[in-house]
Amino acid sequence: MYSISDLKKFKTCPRLYFLEKRNPPPRPPQFIRFDRTISDLAARKLHIPPEQVFIGHTGDAKEKAVTALRTYRWLMKARFEAGKLRVKVPFLHKNGAAWDLYFTSLSLYPPATDLLYYKSVVWVLMQNGVKIRKIQLLHLNETYVRHGEPDPEALFVRSDSFYNAHHHPTLRVREAIAQCTDDPLAIMEKMARAALSDCPEAVYTSHCRGRSTCRFYALCFPLEAQAPHNSILTLSDSAGRRAMWENGRMRLKDAALDEIEGTAQQYAEIMAG
C-alpha cells in the first residue's frame, strides 16, 4: 500500500524512495499530537455536531470510511483507499447528493505548491464514488491574536483559493487540482515497474543539495561527499555549485560571481575559501 508521501518521494527521486524504504529515517518522539489539536479546533470552526461525525483512526479498514458515507453527515480524518493508494481525508460534509471537502493548512497564505497531495485525495475519493460539490481550505488567520483559550472562529480562515507571493487569492483550489498534470495512478504504475528492478542509479538534481542536503548524498555521490572544506560544493544555498564544479571551478575562491545568488553568507564563504 502506498501513501501520498511515497508518491511525492518517488516523483522527486525514485532512488530516494527506494533507499528510504530500505533505511527509513528514525521517527522523532511525539510528546504532543499537534495534528489532533488542529483537527479538533477546525471541527469547531466548521460547527460539526459530535453526534453526526465519523472520526477515522490509524489502521482503519477501508470499509469503515465507505460505510460511514452512508450513515454520517460528517467524516473527519477518514481513511480511504483506491488502487494501492491510501489517504487520510481531513473533512467531508454531506451536502445534498454530494460532499463538501475541506483541507486544513498551517500556512497563513497557502500557495498552490503541493498539488499532488490535493489531487491524490480527490482522485481516491472519486474512485470511491464520492461526488465533490465544493473544495475549501481552512488556513491560519494572520491577524489572529490569542487571548486565553484558542478561538477557532478567529483562528481559521475559509478560502476557495490558493494565494500568490503577495498574499492575494489567485487560482481556485478546484481549478488548480483540475489543472495539475500529476497522475497518481500513472505514478503508482511507474513505482510498480521500478520495484521489479534494482535500486535506480544516482542522478543529480536540484533536490540533492538545495537548502538542505539529502541524507543519502554521500552514498549517491561518494567522491563529492569527500570534497575538502573549501570545495565549491560546500557553497551555501547555491543552485549552480555543481555546474561550476563540473566546469572546473573546484574551490570556493574560483566561484563565478555571476552564477551565485549573492547572499552575504556566500560572499563570506568565498572570501574565507
Residue ranges and their predicted role:
Residues 80-185:
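Nucleic-acid nuclease catalytic cores
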Residues 7, 88, 118, 211-216:
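Short runs of predominantly hydrophobic/aromatic residues within well-ordered alpha helices
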